[in-house]
Each structure stands twice: as structure tokens, then as C-alpha cells.
Swiss-Prot record:
Role summary: Actin is a highly conserved protein that polymerizes to produce filaments that form cross-linked networks in the cytoplasm of cells. Actin exists in both monomeric (G-actin) and polymeric (F-actin) forms, both forms playing key functions, such as cell motility and contraction. In addition to their role in the cytoplasmic cytoskeleton, G- and F-actin also localize in the nucleus, and regulate gene transcription and motility and repair of damaged DNA.
Name the UniProt record assigns to this protein: Actin, cytoplasmic 1
Family: Belongs to the actin family.
The species this protein was found in: Oryzias latipes
Sites bearing Methionine (R)-sulfoxide, chain numbering: M44, M47
Gene name, Swiss-Prot/TrEMBL: actb
């Protein structure tokens, strides 16, 4: 497919926006879903200061900006900022005219219906898209792994969900959603670093903590044992250099932070951990298909990138499942982008071309068309 008519695939995550062309094997643009506004008054005339910055530019100027994420827990909370992010995606990152390309957007399962209606409306009315489609993120991850059956545990920055899919059919009654994901872990790391005497409070400092989390955290196979190791020796300590040259040391925080995925009580939440949520999701499915789901548990999303997470999932689910059950956790190396890759695959299938919602259909039916045409 040529770029001139290629469909666009935009995976709008709560934390990162991944965008590119259908048929490509990786997104061309990956940038933080952030809009930043200056905290201070501009004094130098002719500097061309803007009243808002998006993505990487906001990230690089974060010291003087207040950063806001327009998507929280997978749901758009600020549509004006969201429009800025899409505008930035089309015109600055991909450098295309949105009115010339069909666009595939992604969404978390169990999102409010109004969310996808508004997405549809903005695409057709603000950007004049010729056609669009909204796909469920976890389903795309399964496409990317080359399977038609499996349970996807997709955990990003804003939301974690488990979606069982059998022979290409998602089983909506068994989809479970957990509003605990990367951003909550970043906040938790900010909190436990404060106990060590390092203070991180502003929206800009939160980004530093996110970087610490991504570079140094890992999941312990046995939490209690690891805590013992950390207490008795300094073998687990790592140092991190802050932007001003100060060096901080972190020890048990490295695995205490992602442990909250398995023990949400760390965050004061009463929900089940990701292992139990996955198990509960499987148990909501028909008894005949559970075996196939246990053997095809696919991890996807940035929050599944911690070293050790697949082994820990294997251990925890083995403990919950029947003792003879074969359990396989699939953690593809590109899982950070597997939603986008799945979107790229889907949008370039010849059989998918009749699934697009066209501008004409939208004009006839209005935004509610999205519920009829997109699963």
C-alpha cells in the first residue's frame, strides 16, 4: 500500500501515543500523550513562545510547564487537549493531511459509549477524515501475536484489562478491567522514594520518576525472599543520576513498586492483582475453552515490560489453576507496541476494507454509527 492512500493507525494510550501507517511493522511516531502549558510569564519578545506544547516538546520544556495527560485510565477527560494531540500527530509527526487517509483509532474495552462517539465526531467533523474505525486494544495485541485464541492481559499507563478471545470472538462477559496501571505505579514510586528522603512532587518531577521506574524496576519472583535479600545486602541497590547531576540510590523500591500489580493493597486498592484478574477472567469463560486460554496468555502494553513479570505470572497462575493444567505466558519482545502492530495488520487486511465507517455513513447516521460498525 502506498503512503499516499495508506490508512493511519493511531494508538492513543494514556501515556504514549503511537502513530504510523497501516502495513508498517512499527509506528513512525511515538511520543508522550502530554499537553504542557507555561507556568510563568513570557518576558522575551519575539521568542515565539506558544501557549501550549505537545508531546516530546512539552517533555523537553517540562521544567517551565505544567504537564497534563488528557487521557486518564483509558478515558479521554479533556477533549480540547486530545484534539491538540491528534492535530500534532497528523500535521507534525506524520506530516499528512488527515482528510486524505482513513484512520484506525484504538480504545480500552468497557469504556463509556460517549467516549467513542466523541472520538468519531472529532475525526469526521474536525479533521474531515474520509473513513475511520475504533478497535479494542487487547484484540489488536492478539492479532499481533498471530493468534486467534488466547487471553490478553494488556496493561498500559492508564488501565489494565484482561480480554479472553476464542477463535477471533471476544467474550465480552468475561472481560475484566482494572484501573491500576503504569501511572499508578509511578505515583506509588514517588511516594516510596519520599520515604527514603527524596522528594518528587511536580508534574515534571513525576516524569523523572517514570524514567527511574522504566530503567530500574523489576518484578520479584518471591517478594518476601527478595525483601530479605534487600535488607541483608546491598546487592540490589542501583544508582540513578538526576538531571541536575545529583545521584540517588534505590534498593527495595525497585521491586516494591511493580509488586503493586500483584498486591493492589499496596496502593490502598481493594481489587485483585493482575494474576487473579487474569484467572477470574478465564473462570468466567466456558469450561471447554479454558484450557486454550491458559495455554495462550498473552502479555501486552508498556507495564508488562518489567523484567521478571512473565515468570511471576506463570508462578501465580499455576498456583491458582488446576494442578494438571498447562500454562503458558507469552511475552513478545515488541509487546510495548503490539496494540499498534495489531492495528497495522488489521487495517491492511483486504477483508477489513468493508468495515470502515465512511464519511457518508457518518453524515447519514451521526456518531452512534460507531456502536453498530465497531465491535
Amino acid at each position: 500500500m502506498d503512503d499516499d492512500i495508506a490508512a493511519l493507525v493511531v494508538d492513543n494510550g494514556s501515556g504514549m501515543c503511537k502513530a504510523g501507517f497501516a502495513g508498517d511493522d512499527a509506528p513512525r511516531a511515538v511520543f508522550p500523550s502530554i499537553v504542557g502549558r507555561p507556568r510563568h510569564q513570557g518576558v522575551m519578545v519575539g521568542m515565539g513562545q506558544k501557549d501550549s506544547y505537545v508531546g516530546d516538546e512539552a517533555q523537553s520544556k517540562r521544567g517551565i510547564l505544567t504537564l497534563k495527560y488528557p487521557i486518564e485510565h483509558g478515558i479521554v477527560t479533556n477533549w480540547d487537549d486530545m484534539e491538540k494531540i491528534w492535530h500534532h500527530t497528523f500535521y507534525n509527526e506524520l506530516r499528512i493531511a488527515p482528510e486524505e487517509h482513513p484512520v484506525l483509532l484504538t480504545e480500552a474495552p468497557l469504556n463509556p459509549k460517549a467516549n467513542r462517539e466523541k472520538m468519531t465526531q472529532i475525526m469526521f467533523e474536525t479533521f474531515n477524515s474520509p473513513a475511520m474505525y475504533v478497535a479494542i486494544q487487547a484484540v489488536l495485541s492478539l492479532y499481533a501475536s498471530g493468534r486467534t485464541t488466547g487471553i490478553v492481559m494488556d496493561s498500559g499507563d492508564g488501565v489494565t484489562h484482561t480480554v479472553p478471545i476464542y477463535e477471533g470472538y471476544a467474550l465480552p462477559h468475561a472481560i475484566l478491567r482494572l484501573d491500576l496501571a503504569g501511572r499508578d505505579l509511578t505515583d506509588y514510586l514517588m511516594k516510596i522514594l519520599t520515604e527514603r528522603g527524596y522528594s518528587f512532587t511536580t508534574t515534571a518531577e513525576r516524569e523523572i520518576v517514570r524514567d527511574i521506574k522504566e530503567k530500574l524496576c523489576y518484578v520479584a519472583l518471591d517478594f518476601e525472599q527478595e525483601m530479605g535479600t534487600a535488607a541483608s545486602s546491598s546487592s540490589l541497590e542501583k544508582s540513578y543520576e538526576l538531571p541536575d547531576g545529583q545521584v540517588i540510590t534505590i534498593g527495595n523500591e525497585r521491586f516494591r513498586c511493580p509488586e503493586a500489580l500483584f498486591q493492589p493493597s499496596f496502593l490502598g486498592m481493594e481489587s485483585c492483582g493482575i494474576h487473579e484478574t487474569t484467572y477470574n477472567s478465564i473462570m468466567k469463560c466456558d469450561v471447554d475453552i479454558r484450557k486454550d486460554l491458559y495455554a495462550n496468555t498473552v502479555l501486552s502494553g508498556g507495564t508488562t515490560m518489567y523484567p521478571g513479570i512473565a515468570d511471576r505470572m506463570q508462578k501465580e497462575i499455576t498456583a491458582l489453576a488446576p494442578s494438571t493444567m498447562k500454562i503458558k505466558i507469552i511475552a513478545p519482545p515488541e509487546r510495548k507496541y503490539s496494540v499498534w502492530i495489531g492495528g497495522s495488520i488489521l487495517a491492511s487486511l483486504s477483508t477489513f476494507q468493508q468495515m470502515w465507517i465512511s464519511k457518508q455513513e457518518y453524515d447519514e447516521s451521526g456518531p452512534s454509527i460507531v456502536h453498530r460498525k465497531c465491535f
